[in-house]
Amino acid sequence: MAVPARRTSKAKKNKRRTHYKVTAPTVTFDETTGDYSRSHRVSLKGYYKGRKIAKAAAAE
């Protein structure tokens, strides 16, 4: 079983992790419903590309 020969230092570990970044989700304005929604996904009111395709989610 392979084991590291040397312990990875905090600096080395943190330099490697500098590329792990959180990006903001892409949000578009839906003119049909007047709400903002994520791209390429059905809105909460059941619309996709301006067409009704699903029943709206029930409010609990």
UniProtKB/Swiss-Prot annotation:
GO terms for biological process: translation. One of its GO terms (molecular function) is structural constituent of ribosome. The keyword Ribonucleoprotein applies. Coiled coil: none annotated. GO terms for cellular component: large ribosomal subunit. The keyword Ribonucleoprotein applies. It holds the Pfam family Ribosomal_L32p. It comes from the Bacteria. Keywords: Ribonucleoprotein, Ribosomal protein. Belongs to the bacterial ribosomal protein bL32 family. HAMAP family: Ribosomal_bL32 (MF_00340). This is Large ribosomal subunit protein bL32. It comes from Streptococcus sanguinis (strain SK36).
